[in-house]
Regions:
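Acidic, small/polar-enriched beta strand-loop surface segments
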Residues: 1-10, 153, 165-255, 261-304, ...
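Assembly/oligomerization scaffold segments
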Residues: 1-98
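Short, ordered beta-strand-loop transition motifs
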Residues: 23-32, 81-86, 165-167, 255-258, ...
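Extended Gly/Ser/Thr-rich low-complexity repeat segments
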Residues: 46-58, 102-109, 276-281
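Charged- and aromatic-enriched interaction segments used to assemble
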Residues: 84-190, 197
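Well-ordered beta-strand positions in beta-sheet-rich domains
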Residues: 20, 73-77, 89, 105, ...
Length: 317
């Protein structure tokens, strides 16, 4: 039997009472987020936090079991406080919060992606390093009434990359290029519930149409995948054919494979993060065993227990 424990600090305060903590982390979204729900009252007195906590306060959430130790599940910043609905909710965002600063309007000509990212970091007054796996150059990139966050979001939408912050570094990589640790889940041991569907690749045919804007205003298209499958249209930041084809093949890989779609839910152990790999074992159906890239993890901590929902991406092996 494990004893649940937490250590949550916001600004100069340490929380002693909580109703629930919900943390969402994903390689497919720019920001990791957390929502801390506090009781509306303490010892029959309304809980007053708005005069103690403020937007921009540092947030560190550590959760776990006394017997196994606590893990830092989230680090970020307090974004806003809500007192609606009979309780107090603290909405938090990871270091992407620091990029929500206005950038000057500018039209950049022939700017390399890594240089663009370095410019975003600099204009937001930050000192993050940039680690970028892509080498393409934008013919033209327009910044108009945008924040650093808006620019990063546009880049992510156009290239389909994983963009995230880790160890004072802004990372941008193709999905699955940077892997974390391997986690093991056995349906008979540490999976509380699952929402999984097993598919064959031939049943999930996908045709990806990659579109890119040419200098003369026309749109260039490159098709990848299987004809007759579900058609998906995506944008590409560059208009050279190899880059467009690679972008399309990446999307096909994400969507078409023999394996599971969906998620599994376990407990706080093992610790699993987005970009980790998860190996699933089912003694009843060993042919379905496989290793998957983790795209998202939702962690919930309350009086009902600690749960971790792990969302599976493409199959690794």
């Amino acid at each position: 039997m494990y004893t649940m424990a937490f250590d949550i600090r916001i600004g100069t305060y340490k929380l002693c009472m909580i109703d629930k903590v919900e943390i969402h982390r994903s390689v497919e979204l720019l920001a990791d987020t957390a929502v801390i729900t506090l009781p509306a009252s303490e010892y029959n007195h309304a809980l007053q936090v708005e005069d103690k906590l403020k937007r921009g306060d540092k947030v560190i959430i550590t959760l776990g079991y006394e017997e196994a130790g606590l893990e830092t599940e989230f680090e970020g910043w307090l974004q806003r406080i809500s007192t609606d609905g009979g309780n107090v909710k603290l909405y938090c965002e990871d270091d992407i919060f620091l990029f929500r600063k206005d950038m000057k309007n500018e039209v950049l000509q022939k700017v390399a992606l890594k240089d663009l990212l370095a410019k975003v970091v600099s204009e937001c007054g930050l000192s993050f390093k940039v680690e970028c796996s892509y080498s393409w150059t934008y013919g033209k990139f327009v910044i108009n009434n945008a924040t650093g966050y808006d620019v990063l979001k546009k880049v992510q939408e156009e290239c389909g990359a994983d963009i995230y912050l880790q160890d004072e570094t802004l990372h941008i990589h193709p999905p699955g290029e940077k892997m974390g640790v391997e986690c093991f889940y056995d349906f008979a041991l540490n999976v509380e519930e699952d929402n999984l569907t097993y598919h064959r690749a031939e049943d999930k045919k996908v045709q990806v149409i990659v579109k890119a804007l040419m200098p003369d205003g026309t749109v260039k298209e490159v098709e990848t995948g299987a004809t007759g499958g579900d058609k998906i249209e995506i944008k590409c930041a560059t208009n050279d054919e190899p880059s467009m084809k690679a972008r399309g093949e990446l999307e096909v890989k994400r969507r078409s494979f023999d394996g599971y779609d969906g998620s599994i839910t376990g407990w706080l152990i093992p610790v699993c993060r987005p970009s980790d790999s998860v190996t699933l074992h089912d003694a009843d159906y060993p042919y379905k065993d496989g290793t998957y890239f983790v795209t998202a993890v939702d962690t919930e901590f309350s009086s009902a227990g600690g749960k971790r929902k792990v969302s599976l991406g493409f199959r690794l092996s």
